[in-house]
Amino acid sequence: MVLSAERAVFAVLCFEGPDRYSLAGGLGSRIAGLTEALAEAGAQTHLYFIGSPDAPGVEERVGGRLILHRWAQWISRYYPQGVYQGELEKLYDFNETVPWHLVDQVVRPAADAGRHVFVLAEDWHTADLLCRCSDILHGAGLRRQATLVWNANNPMGFERVNWGRLGYVSNLTTVSRYMKHYMWGLGQNPTVIPNGIPAALLAPVPAEAVAALRTALGAGAPDPVLVKVARWDPDKRWLMAVQAVAALRGSGVRARLIAKGGIEPHQAEVLEVARRLGLRVGEAHAGERPSTQSLAAALAGAREADVINLRGFLPAELLQALYGAADGVLANSGLEPFGLVGLEAMAAGALVFTGATGEDYARPLQNALVLETDDPGEIARYWHQLQGRPDIAARLRAAARATAAEYAWPAVIEVLMHRLDYLAAQTGR
């Protein structure tokens, strides 16, 4: 019989988490979706993460089945800028204290109740922590009551990982075939369990929100509004994006780019290149409590710009509205371990340009436009090919939504249960 959520207890270890303070990219979104989906499936789920210093240390959600353990709050009070400010101090506290709490407060009570615990740890910050958990479990005589799993979302921090020790005490997983092949080069063979998106993202984007944003931008055929949401990182191919806008404008298409990044320094280089290409760069901010109305007003104020640098935090529902309002979404990374933004944009029914590395969900000209090069002309050429063929664009958008549904968290949880059932039965780790 395949493992069921009701028969297991899950403990998820991750630096990022669902708090705004703890969200720095796709990892926080992944963990929020994963843990909520596990709890909704009936599993008692504990999440240990670096949480907001202003929120409760322990919080119950989903009818008490999801328990949030906000860690290192006393340190976070000195670092108000987010989860990675004061990173090493927080990491030291995480490594030194979480394993003991996990064993005493989660594994031991579960074992006494006859339930098996699955410890799911994410990325390099938790590699040493998981090894310590294994040692403490052995010392407590509880090692066989827990299955340890370490998941790699990307190669960041791989140089810090003791692969021999980690591979000995835990089962390794990753999020795409690209990452599996990458890790082969390190002598590891992880099991692939795909990422997921909240099922709520599959709800149709409100037509009034799409209309408000497009009206604010003065959007309309034949001049496209393109959207790119990513960290300001060279791997995300921001330069390719602004160069594609310049190429389209050079061919007579008045393309514009809404750029939503983070606080990374690569931003300055990208915007300077845009200016050198003759593009007008503007800035928009939807406010501390963004809404459709405030976002529309901010975009309207910058509508004359060719590149609009959208600053500040946007909740998921506004990002989905932005994807739905766009004529195209550029998820054109050169190195993408999975590509969560591309999948989220697909859920909104967007016309998505993806890269060709870890985006296992993307199928060329079936549900996305898959870019094989770093040539901005490839984006421009695809755009020109689609003009006069609204049937192709409509087919891609419909197929994109269907694909996104296959990666909703409830569907991914089913895959996860099958994989964990095998790992627990075969490896004994």
Language-model features and meaning:
Residues 347-355:
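Short hydrophobic beta-strand element within catalytic cores of glycosyltransferases
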Residues 218-236, 242-245, 258-260:
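Conserved donor-binding/catalytic core segment of Leloir-type glycosyltransferases
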Residues 178, 196:
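Carbohydrate-associated surface elements
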Residues 2-9, 37-117, 287-307:
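A conserved catalytic-core segment of Leloir-type glycosyltransferases
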Residues 137, 267-317:
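Nucleotide-activated donor-binding/catalytic signature segment of Leloir-type glycosyltransferases, i.e.
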Residues 369-376, 385-390:
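Conserved acidic donor-binding segment of nucleotide-sugar-dependent glycosyltransferases
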